[in-house]
Amino acid sequence: MWKLIQILTIAVLVNGSYYSFNFAFWVSGPNTKMILALFGLLWFLYDSWRGGRGISIPHVLLGGAIFSILYSLVNLVAVEVNNTDDYSYANYITTFLVWAFSVYPAIRCIRIVHGEVTIPRIAYYLVGVTVFQCITGLLNDNFPAMQSFTDSIVFTAGEFYESIDRIRCFSVALDPAGVRFSLVLLLISAVVCTDTEVQKNRWIVFLLLISYILISVIGNMVARTTSTGMAMGLVLLLFRSNTIGFRIRKEMVQTMATFSLLLVVFSAAGVILYNTSEYFRGELSFAFEGFFNYFNKGEFTTGSTEVLQTMWRWPEDNKTWIIGSGWYGGFIYGTDIGYCRLILYSGLIGFVTFASSFVYYAYYFARKYPRYLWLFLFYLAMTFIVWLKVSTDILMIYVFFFWFTAEESDHINGIFPEATPELCE
């Protein structure tokens, strides 16, 4: 029982960072991510003091901080040069540090409870809270009492969501949900294909594959951005298992057979629900509108992609191309497209600086953990694909990899079988 409480506590900490929210009873207060970041910073300083070797900052944290400071300065210059008061990204260094330290409590608790932090363990908790978000989304959408209960805990713009008739999960919705779901789907595929210990445990593989399908289906009902991660996750799964070459790796034969069987079962269930439930017919039609349009009209299009095609906005003078207009918030340019909003805010200088930081993260982790090379390459691709629709970034997933100890990093690379806690390298 005590172990279950510990695991649930870690899940709450992971959810509070990855799917952060404001409390309904403290709307003007800090969100859960900020609270955890403060707690994480204090815990990090305590661990550094207890280690007796001073403050040991992870190399990737230092590198990310440098990029964040540079990006903040560029945005500050854009605001000052254009004489605006839109400081949306001018304090990005603060955003970076909040993200980085908000996961520290969860990582430390994983180390305390399980003995060491591994990529599969991070995946288990992220998958768990993501499935929780998806299930609560369906419950909220079908049971007003459940939605009222959620609203008593989490502050959301309820009237807005009701006006657009979209599913709200426990603490995330729309494109922010779709991006986060996509990142978790890629992580599932990478862990299933890469970690030999996971592959040996058929029960864990079974649960991960079921979770993959659930997140894909319900996630697309919440936000069709999820389809990006779903498609990329499938490509990663098929590629890494060598299914594409019709010579499936021996250790992946049973995994792919299980996945194929689950796809058949869930597809059959989907067909039944589509034909017997008006609610699920509407949600599935929305979730997979592109596929329905392809089979019915011969074109893979959705209403949202057609709207996005009308949203391309670019600078109209050299100054804006170089340093931007200093305007980001307020939907001033009438576009959601990430590339447009970022370039219009601080020009190509700002955009290149911002994009370079995510190239750095992918490069750093791909070199540090070569077994997971393809995961980080796909995360890099995801960074630039997401900006075709929204301007959010994917820092929230990278920060979970910031805090491995040297021994844990060796274990991830298959060098040592066990890890002992020490300060992060």
Residue ranges, per PLM feature:
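Transmembrane alpha-helices of multi-pass inner-membrane enzymes
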Residues: 186-191, 231-237, 375-384, 391-425
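Interfacial loop-to-transmembrane-helix boundary motif in multi-pass membrane proteins
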Residues: 57-65, 97, 105-147
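A membrane-periplasm/extracellular boundary helix in multi-pass inner-membrane enzymes
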Residues: 135, 238-293, 315-317
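TM-adjacent membrane-interface loops and short helices in multi-pass inner/ER membrane proteins
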Residues: 286, 290-334, 348-350
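Alpha-helical transmembrane segments of multi-pass inner-membrane proteins
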Residues: 120-148, 172-221, 227-240
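N-terminal hydrophobic segments of proteins, predominantly signal-anchor/transmembrane helices
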Residues: 2-21, 37-101, 381-383
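Hydrophobic transmembrane alpha-helices and their immediate junctions
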Residues: 235, 345-386, 410-413
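A juxtamembrane structural motif centered on a specific transmembrane helix
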Residues: 1-6, 48-51, 248-267, 368, ...
